[in-house]
């Protein structure tokens, strides 16, 4: 467990963003990438390690997509030759004044410990410290926000379709959603591979505060810079009232996730921070 000996912030820092999906990762990327000492490259979500190791996440088929777009072509080279991925970010950190780079891909939350070790080793070979970031959101709120995003993309967002889509989601419990909701797995994997002081693990509901942002900057070994608190990125809001029976189904589905967070971060007041999950995730066994 832990990083390679002898690496210091003089080499810069690589941020490995592991989500969770719909838990502030787009806002996080926007704030970090706007720093003068940061360069996150040509994508926010590179989807390399999930494409290579998590076919169930649905990103492996991107290998077959058109190579006409430069971004797609460059990404294919990373997948075909993963060493290029590490070399690319190392090259960004060699630019004058750049101390921070990274890949913030929410589906990385499902990566296995052995994959995290390989990522860690790839940057250790280049003497670059890696700092994982994992943000968790009220699991019921997160799924509701995810479903709204999907319906909005399809131009089908209204009260009736939202309620019915959530009802169907509770019945099907698809793997792609479960992968991104398993906070317990991500916490376990991070604990197995990294030292506690190498990780920034917090809640979406606490992210937008000076104290949380200062802690993040400390973990990343960069000076504190005030983010744009008012910037909104990929916000999913409606006035739809979700029926209690669906909230109960979501609570039953997400109870193991809630239990894992309580066990790991029991010092937090989840009744106040995650009111929906606290009310509806009643079976923590």
Label every PLM stretch briefly.
Residues 75-82, 108-114, 178, 205-210:
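Acidic-and-aromatic substrate-binding clefts and catalytic sites of carbohydrate-active enzymes
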Residues 24-29, 48-50, 57-58, 108-113, ...:
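Short catalytic/ligand-binding loop motif for oxyanion handling, primarily in non-cytosolic enzymes
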Residues 82-89, 116, 120, 187-188, ...:
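Generic structural signal for well-ordered alpha-helices
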Residues 126-146:
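Conserved phosphate-donor/acceptor-positioning beta-strand/loop module used by diverse small-molecule
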Residues 111-133:
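ATP-dependent NMP and nucleoside kinases share a basic, alpha-helical "lid"
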Residues 44, 133, 137, 178, ...:
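The conserved 3'-phosphoadenosine-5'-phosphosulfate
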Residues 71-72, 103-109, 165-179, 234-248:
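Surface-exposed cleft-lining segments at the edges of enzyme active sites
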Residues 1-99, 103-105, 153-166, 194, ...:
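PAPS-dependent sulfotransferase catalytic core
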